[in-house]
Amino acid sequence: MKKIINTIPENPAKLYSCAATVSKKGLISYRTRIVAISDKTIKMHLVHTSTTMMHTRKYIKLLRACGEKDIANIVETLYRMCIDHKAQDAVYNAEDGTISVMV
């Protein structure tokens, strides 16, 4: 049975049994920061490969399992917008609740 992390760690830890790592600062897949979380923004740099996209979906699942539903919803929205717009970068601004997609 796979070990599930019950809390998002302060320091980088493996995401389930993947080559990706997670921390309170976000998600790193193959040495590329995919999700960066700060007090004011959540940034996504989505590399459109099947592995990185799988890591992102697992990260969203982990956030929900840890009770971080609001952050999970924002990350999932950024993920879907990157896919829909065929973009690599999207940013959520917490101050005004806006999302910007860079195509």
Task: Tell what function each PLM region has.
Residues 1-103:
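Terminal leader/tail segments of proteins
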